[in-house]
Structure formats: structure tokens, C-alpha cells
Swiss-Prot record:
Belongs to the ATPase alpha/beta chains family. The keyword Transport applies. It is a peripheral membrane protein. It is an enzyme of class 7 (translocase). Its EC number is 7.1.2.2. F-type ATPases have 2 components, CF(1) - the catalytic core - and CF(0) - the membrane proton channel. CF(1) has five subunits: alpha(3), beta(3), gamma(1), delta(1), epsilon(1). CF(0) has four main subunits: a, b, b' and c. ATP binds at residues 171-178. It comes from the Bacteria. It catalyses: ATP + H2O + 4 H(+)(in) = ADP + phosphate + 5 H(+)(out). InterPro entries: ATP_synth_asu-like_sf (IPR023366), ATP_synth_asu_C (IPR000793), ATP_synth_asu_C_sf (IPR038376), ATP_synth_F1_a_nt-bd_dom (IPR033732), ATP_synth_F1_asu (IPR005294), ATPase_a/bsu_AS (IPR020003), ATPase_F1/V1/A1_a/bsu_N (IPR004100), ATPase_F1/V1/A1_a/bsu_N_sf (IPR036121). This is ATP synthase subunit alpha.
Length: 506
């Protein structure tokens, strides 16, 4: 029996099959791991990878394409990558690193990728920003003109900082660099400033102590902590400062004032050096790669005071650099000094002599901050830096001279009292009116007959007296930010009256 084949049936069956076929064809840029180790992977086959593109490995680890070479791609891993092995497949995602941003981050501790690490649950944020974004241009900025009060008398008087400024805090280890940064954050309590503290390559216990201090002082209500501790991959330690800048940038473009602390950029440079050497990039001075200046300049240039048209927001950056035996002429310190608008130099000799904060006024400078200093502070602080510098010179000279004339002795005595005046305990920032009153007393001779060891108790008592007794002066300076005739008269009266009670009690 012959089977008759009807062409129309065949064509309808084929038609049906074609209509039912719905499998999508996806084109993916996939490569193969040639070599992996030390947080670095070499990948073959990713011909279309972009510089800085995120790559996804078989085990879910994310990497960043860094070296685009002729026959392979060098990528850095953002995780342990323990299950990645030779022959594993890698997919290019077509995306560049970005993090969630928004109000939900305030009060939280996150890692370098914006993921919460404080055990308080997920961060619900609908917005995200690229970790690397261009700095504001010339037209987008305006000059620094508003003060960023640190609450530390020595800094606010001699090395003032303005909103939108980049001021380097530099010194040897254990000289109080982080303490200055934390005090500055605590002092922003009433100022409507969003603070971002970036901990790079530090011990996890140190970061926990900082967070605890901020919580105790009520500062976590307006602070975000970004932490890439010493145990994390070098890639995350390198990315953490950019993450901090991105979070602050979100608020800056919303018209808010922000403060970012990078603690510290020496460790970021070391992490970048480690990555670069493992990627076989040619080393330069101190084995750092040739573009180590650029990693810091592109980060710190993102700090700015925005123009009125862009909402008047600002990002103030306080990068920290650790020196070895006070050597500020090393590679990374000189790089960052040249990028920033001034530096606060902390001396281990002053610190060990009990002068804390151990600010060395001779080589500390603020290039733009004086324009932002309040009128009241400008009036009293003008002479103090010069007097302290002269005191340091005279003190060195007095060690060799046996008989000094009265004028020199008086200058030495006043210098000692000014030195005492600027001492300040940790985590106790002062308001502007308190700083102005203390400095006014010092430079106008009110302390000349107070014994040096009693200066601290005199200033503490004076602050209490101004809070409770003579409120006219405090309110005047608070509202006008200037030391007018009325405020000065009230301050003189308060100083004279307080001095009588202090002497009577002594």
C-alpha cells in the first residue's frame, strides 16, 4: 500500500513548528580564566571588555576589568573567589560599578559596594550612582566662603577650613589624626551637615570603636560610615574612598553641605600598589604605579562648593595621610599636599610633650579657609599664629641664653599660656563663641598673671560662666557671627568679673 505525501500537510506542519519556536538567542561576551590567584584573574576571550567593566565569574564573584591587553584581560576580584579555577567561564556584564545612594544610608555602616555590614537589615534605596563620576567643572563651582567649624580651637583659629575645601590631616601614627576628624563630625550636630567617614585598611575593632563613639555623641543621626577593613581584598580598600565620595555627592547635588573623611589615603595607595604590581604594571617611585597621583587627584577634585544655580551644595574633604618618622617629603604625602588646599600637620614631638591636639602651626596652612572664617574669629585669631611662631623661636633661643630682658620674658610667658589655651580634650568640640572668648582672654593679657598650670581650669570655668552668667555676649556672637562693640564690651565685663571670682577661689 503506497503512502501519498501531501505537500500542503508538510508545509503546514513546518509552519506550525516555526510558530511554536520561541527560544531567544542571547549574545554574551564570555571568556575563560587562564590564571587566578592573589585577588587577580587573567581571562582569555573577552575581546569587547571595557576598562572598569564589571565581570561575573561562574561562582558569582564580581571582578573589575583593569588591564586590557592584546591577548587577555587582567581583572581584580571583589571577593575571595575561592571557587574560581583555570577554565572557569567569565561573563562581561556591560555595566560599571555603581552603589545605592539616598537618605536610607544615613546612620548605617556599609562596605565599599554600599552593602550594609551593621546587622540592621537591607538598605531600601531606589537611586544609585556610578562610583566613578566626573568632578564638577569650573563654571559649576564657586569660591569657598562658608566656615566648616571643627570645634577645635587651634584649627578654627589658625588653620580655618571652609565648606568645599580639601584640607589634609597629616602626621605620624598615633598623633591624633582620626581624633581631629571624629571631633569635626561631632561638631556638625547643629549644622545640618551630612558626614561620611571612610575607613580604609583599618582594624575592624578600630572602626567599631569609631562607630560607638559617634553613636554615644549622637553623631550617627547624620553620619554614614564606609568601611573596607584590613581583612578585605585590596580592590575594596581601593574602591572605598570613591564610594564615600559618591554617597556625599548625592547629597551635595541635592543642595546639602557634606563632609567626607578619608582615613587614610596612604592605605588606599598601598592597596592600589598591590593591585598594580600583581597586574604586572611597571612600578615607579617607591614601587607605586605611574598613575598613583591620578587616583588621589580624581578623588579629591570631586570635593567642591557648588554654584547657586546648582543648589549651593558642598563637599568638604578631610583626607588623612600617615607619615613615617615625620617625613612629609615622601611620594604619597607630597602628592596629596599638592592636590589639597592646605594641610594640618600633627607633630609626634608635640603629642609626646602633652600638647594635644598636636598641631604644628609653623608648617600647617589653610590656603582658602581664611575667606570663610567668621568675623569674630578673624578679629581675635589674627595675632595668635604669629605669636606662637615667635614663641617657638624664642623658646629655642632661651635654652642657651642665661639673662633675658623683660620683654622677652613676657613674650615667653604669654606664649606658654597661649599653648595651654589651645590644649583641648578629645571628643569635646567648642562652639565659636567659646573659642572667641578663650582666645580674646589669651591675646589681651587676661591670663598673664594666671599660673600656667591653672590656665586649663580658668578656661573651663570661663566657658561655664559664659553659659550661665553673661549670656548677652554668647547670643550676640551666635546670631551676628561678629565681635561688635556691644559683644566686646559684654565679653570684657564677663572676663573681669570671672577673673575676680577665679582669683578669690584660687
Amino acid at each position: 500500500m503506497s503512502i501519498s505525501i501531501r505537500p500542503d500537510e508538510i508545509s503546514s506542519i513546518i509552519q506550525q513548528q516555526i510558530e511554536q519556536y520561541d527560544q531567544e538567542v542571547k549574545v554574551a561576551n564570555v571568556g575563560t580564566v587562564l590564571q587566578v590567584g592573589d585577588g587577580i584573574a587573567r581571562i582569555y576571550g573577552l575581546e569587547k571588555a571595557m576598562a572598569g567593566e564589571l565581570l561575573e565569574f561562574e561562582d558569582g564573584t564580581i571582578g573589575i576589568a583593569q588591564n586590557l591587553e592584546e591577548d587577555n584581560v587582567g581583572a581584580v576580584l571583589m571577593g575571595e573567589g575561592l571557587e574560581i579555577q583555570e577554565g572557569s567561564s567569565v561573563t562581561a556584564t556591560g555595566r560599571i560599578a555603581q552603589i545605592p545612594v539616598g537618605e536610607a544610608l544615613i546612620g548605617r555602616v556599609v562596605d565599599a559596594l554600599g552593602r550594609p555590614i551593621d546587622g540592621k537589615g537591607d538598605i531600601k534605596s531606589s537611586e544609585s550612582r556610578l562610583i566613578e563620576s566626573p568632578a564638577p567643572g569650573i563654571i559649576a563651582r564657586r569660591s569657598v566662603h562658608e566656615p566648616m567649624q571643627t570645634g577645635i580651637t587651634a584649627i578654627d583659629s589658625m588653620i580655618p577650613i571652609g565648606r568645599g575645601q580639601r584640607e589634609l590631616i597629616i602626621g605620624d601614627r598615633q598623633t591624633g589624626k582620626t581624633a581631629i576628624a571624629i571631633d569635626t563630625i561631632i561638631n556638625q550636630k547643629e549644622e545640618d551637615v551630612i558626614c561620611v567617614y571612610v575607613a580604609i585598611g583599618q582594624k575592624a575593632s578600630t572602626v567599631a570603636n569609631v562607630v560607638q563613639t559617634l553613636q554615644e555623641k549622637g553623631a550617627m543621626d547624620y553620619t554614614i560610615v564606609v568601611a573596607a577593613s584590613a581583612s578585605e581584598p585590596a580592590t575594596l580598600q581601593y574602591l572605598a574612598p570613591y564610594t564615600g565620595a559618591t554617597i556625599a555627592e548625592y547629597f551635595m547635588y541635592k543642595g546639602k553641605a557634606t563632609l567626607v573623611i578619608y582615613d587614610d589615603l596612604s592605605k588606599q595607595a598601598q592597596a592600589y600598589r598591590q593591585m598594580s604590581l600583581l597586574l604586572r604594571r611597571p612600578p615607579g617611585r617607591e614601587a607605586y604605579p605611574g598613575d598613583v597621583f591620578y587616583i588621589h587627584s580624581r578623588l579629591l577634585e570631586r570635593a567642591a562648593k557648588l554654584s547657586d544655580e546648582l543648589g549651593k551644595g558642598s563637599m568638604t574633604a578631610l583626607p588623612i595621610i600617615e607619615t613615617q618618622a615625620g617625613d612629609v617629603s615622601a611620594y604619597i604625602p607630597t602628592n596629596v599636599i599638592s592636590i589639597t588646599d592646605g594641610q594640618i600637620f600633627l607633630s609626634s614631638d608635640l603629642f609626646n610633650a602633652g600638647i594635644r591636639p598636636a598641631v604644628n602651626p609653623g608648617i600647617s596652612v589653610s590656603r582658602v579657609g581664611s575667606a570663610a572664617q567668621t568675623k569674630a574669629m578673624k578679629k581675635v585669631a589674627g595675632k595668635i599664629k604669629l605669636e606662637l611662631a615667635q614663641f617657638d623661636d624664642l623658646q629655642a633661643f632661651a635654652q642657651f641664653a642665661s639673662d633675658l630682658d623683660k620683654a622677652t620674658q613676657d613674650q615667653l610667658a604669654r606664649g606658654q599660656r597661649l599653648r595651654e589655651l589651645l590644649k583641648q580634650p578629645q571628643n569635646s568640640p567648642l562652639s565659636v563663641y567659646e573659642q572667641v572668648a578663650i582666645l580674646y582672654a589669651g591675646i589681651n593679657g587676661y591670663l598673664d598673671d594666671v599660673p600656667v598650670d591653672k590656665v586649663t581650669s580658668f578656661t573651663q570655668g570661663l566657658r561655664e560662666y559664659l553659659k550661665t552668667g553673661k549670656t548677652q555676649y554668647a547670643e550676640g556672637v551666635r546670631t551676628s557671627k561678629a565681635l561688635g562693640d556691644a559683644e566686646e564690651a559684654a565679653l570684657k565685663e564677663a572676663l573681669t568679673e570671672y577673673k575676680k571670682t577665679f582669683k578669690a577661689a584660687a
